């Protein structure tokens, strides 16, 4: 049984993990992790997690903007990184770590998976990021539905 978070909700299902991809690189403070599943009944579940190692001080404007909650600094991970704007100290009693941002989409149509992964530049041109492209490349080897919409695109 798989569990995928969608904000504060949890999706539980049986199926197969088709692919995973991450934008993490050495030295990254923030990155995206994608997972693509196919349920036993044929639905696709696309999961995206925005990961952050950054923490803030109480006076940082990002605390309010992101809706961050205070925690005792002693529970910070050893990998936690102070915000470059507010420069909080790890020796502070209370800090405001950025939250992981969980998002998921359930769809019966593999086209909806691609549509969710497409980005648009300022001129309106559609493209796939490298992390999305890697996710789909592996998933296409595992699933005919993804392969049929990813490898060949019909242009009207």
Residue locations for each model-derived region?
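Negatively charged, low-complexity tracts enriched in Asp/Glu with abundant Ser/Thr
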Residues: 1-25
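Amphipathic, interaction-prone secondary-structure segments
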Residues: 16-44
